[in-house]
A protein has these predicted regions:
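Hydrophobic small-molecule pocket/channel-lining residues, especially in calycin-type beta-barrels
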Residues: 2-176
Length: 176
């Protein structure tokens, strides 16, 4: 004969220890700097990638439920020789096992970028690797926080890990 739920079953359920709710690591809170609406403008320098030109993007970034990750969306404008205009979805987080920040981005141009980041004082440094013309290229994005409402950025490329070429430089300004 099956047991009917009753006081005994309910008492057992209440006696179960409550599951600990996971809390974000303290480092995760630092990603909150990027939450909001941003406008970024800058210049792509001439180089092996082409003649360069102006770039811009608008960005909306928010906390994902649980406050472990920041999710964002960019609408960008680039010179046509570099792929032109598009959009990108990205997720930022912190890997407590590796003690490193993470950045995963997916663009409307079919690109997927995976970066690792560090924060030292007011300087964020993001590194990644891509394949260009069949060869590995190291990438480095530095973001120097100027104030709660702005930061400078610089994106560099290297084929040997020692010599870096500046691809683009710009400034981001928070709108909200």
């Amino acid at each position: 004969m099956p047991r009917k739920p009753g006081i005994t079953t309910k008492a057992r359920e209440k006696a179960k220890p409550a599951q600990a709710v996971a809390k974000p690591a303290p480092e995760v809170a630092k990603l909150g700097y990027f939450v909001g609406k941003w406008a970024t403008q800058g210049t792509i320098l001439p180089g092996p990638w082409g003649s360069g030109g102006d770039f811009s993007w608008t960005e909306t970034t928010e906390w994902m439920s649980g406050n472990f990750f920041v999710v964002g969306h960019w609408d960008f404008k680039m010179p046509a020789e570099l792929g032109g205009d598009g959009e990108e979805l990205f997720v930022m987080g912190y890997d407590t096992n590796r003690n490193v920040y993470s950045f995963d981005a997916f663009s409307s141009q079919g690109l997927h970028q995976v970066s690792k980041g560090t924060l030292s004082g007011d300087l964020w440094t993001w590194t990644s690797e891509s394949i260009q013309n069949g060869k590995p290229v190291q990438q480095k994005m530095t973001m120097e926080i100027l104030s709660p409402l702005s930061y400078n950025l610089k994106f560099e490329l290297s084929t040997d890990g020692a010599t870096w070429m500046t691809f683009m430089e710009g400034k981001a300004v928070k709108k909200q």
